Each structure stands twice: as C-alpha cells, then as structure tokens.
Amino acid sequence: MIPIAEVLNKGLIVSVQAPLGSPMRDPDVIAAMAEASLRNGAIGVRLESPEHIGAVRRRCPEALIIGLWKCTFPNSSVYITPGWREIQGVWSAGADVIALDATERIRPEGQLLADLIQRARQELRAT
C-alpha cells in the first residue's frame, strides 16, 4: 500500500459507488469496478458501506480504501459516516481512511465531531 501522505499529494482516487436500487450496487460488481480502476492507474478507491469495503478489501487486499457509510436518521441531517457505529463499521470492514461529515451539525446520537475523532484515534488507533 502507498503511504497516505504520498497519496494525498498526487494520484487519482476513484469513487466507486452505486445508488440504492441500482443493479450495480452488488458488492461483487463494486469490487470488480474498484479492481478495474486500480489496474488502470487509480492509487485508491472511495467506497460506501462496510459491505462494499469488505468486498473490495478481499478482492484487492493492497488497495488504499477511503471508506464512508451513508446513513439517514430522522433527528439529524448528518449523512456521511454520522456516528460511532458507522465509523467502527467502516474501519472494521477494512478502510484505511474514514471519510465523515466534518460539520458541527447535530449528529444522530448527539455526539460531537471532536469526540468522535478522539475516540477513533484512541480505540481504533486511527491517526
């Protein structure tokens, strides 16, 4: 895997996602598209959901994966990796980097962004 610092300075990261209801949303299809992207020059992929992250990690074990989990909650407009459960799910599935909503909006369980980041650093050893 390419060191994260190098990735952030150069290269192409391809977002490999499909909307709900799409026949392309199948984890095997997502993994195949991610592999094709990596074989053709992408240095990493951005994936949505633990299921897709896990499928790509199994198929492309050396891939740089930026993971997120889109979730809707009735009491919050935060959508991208909104809380601890989602952070933990993305990380456990095999993401190297966790993408999350970095706004100060109210999160589903009232968690603060700073607290979530601190917890991820401590419990997941995410830097």
Predicted stretch roles:
Residues 1-127:
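Alpha/beta enzyme core
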